[in-house]
Amino acid sequence: MYPVDLHMHTVASTHAYSTLSDYIAQAKQKGIKLFAITDHGPDMEDAPHHWHFINMRIWPRVVDGVGILRGIEANIKNVDGEIDCSGKMFDSLDLIIAGFHEPVFAPHDKATNTQAMIATIASGNVHIISHPGNPKYEIDVKAVAEAAAKHQVALEINNSSFLHSRKGSEDNCRAVAAAVRDAGGWVALGSDSHAAFTMGEFEECLKILDAVDFPPERILNVSPRRLLNFLESRGMAPIAEFADL
């Protein structure tokens, strides 16, 4: 098991079922050292208000030896790469994930989907692209992976895509992983938990990575320090409370 999980949702996204405290308890039980809460951006119908993200600044950084990153799974809104995260939200957040969600950006043709994703990557506002292997959104995988490597944005392999949602993602995710490997980019693993019980579960992701001989040194979840070094290389100030994770 990797000790870092970068994608999960709380009851603030009302189709999810666990609280921050639930995730902390599960992290302690499973040996997770660092995790990110990434509730859906406010343009989703049942997402939290933007104040929810701004007020994450009141959270403790570490509880019982478990580090907590303040994050969002923002929505890609258009071909210009605009996302539903702005202003004071950026000031309060450590981790910005962004991806396609049908209520905000309906599936388009391959060229349009690719343009929107690459524009988001190039914007400098995003650390990780969520579930880029979604079969409903055809993309130019090679072009996206090369853009992500150039701009130091990780592409996610999402465990939930193989179990609960986005059925038919396997072939696309293998292609994404292979393209990131060839481009020298980063992969992020996400449980995409909507209930704390699945936190830290990456078994299906690892099957995808093993199938393409993906180099472990390019997986962000291997250690808290690797993930924090990545975020700091993207401009995040070092967080003193995380020094001993």
Swiss-Prot record:
Listed HAMAP family: YcdX_phosphat (MF_01561)
Keywords: Hydrolase, Metal-binding, Zinc
GO molecular function list: phosphatase activity; zinc ion binding
Protein's GO biological process: bacterial-type flagellum-dependent swarming motility
Organism listed in the record: Escherichia coli O139:H28 (strain E24377A / ETEC)
Protein name as it appears in the record: Probable phosphatase YcdX
Obligatory cofactor(s): Zn(2+)
Residues that coordinate or bind Zn(2+) 2: 15, 40, 194
EC number, as in UniProt: 3.1.3.-
Quaternary structure annotation from Swiss-Prot or TrEMBL: Homotrimer.
PANTHER family: PHOSPHATASE YCDX-RELATED
Binding residues annotated for Zn(2+) 1, in chain numbering: 7, 9, 73, 192
Gene: ycdX
Keyword Zinc: yes
Family membership: Belongs to the PHP family.
Binding site for Zn(2+) 3: 73, 101, 131
UniProt cross-references to InterPro entries, sorted A to Z: Phosphatase_YcdX_put, PHP_dom, PHP_phosphatase, Pol/His_phosphatase_N, Pol/histidinol_Pase-like
Gene Ontology cellular-component terms listed: cytosol
Cofactor info, note text: Binds 3 Zn(2+) ions per subunit.
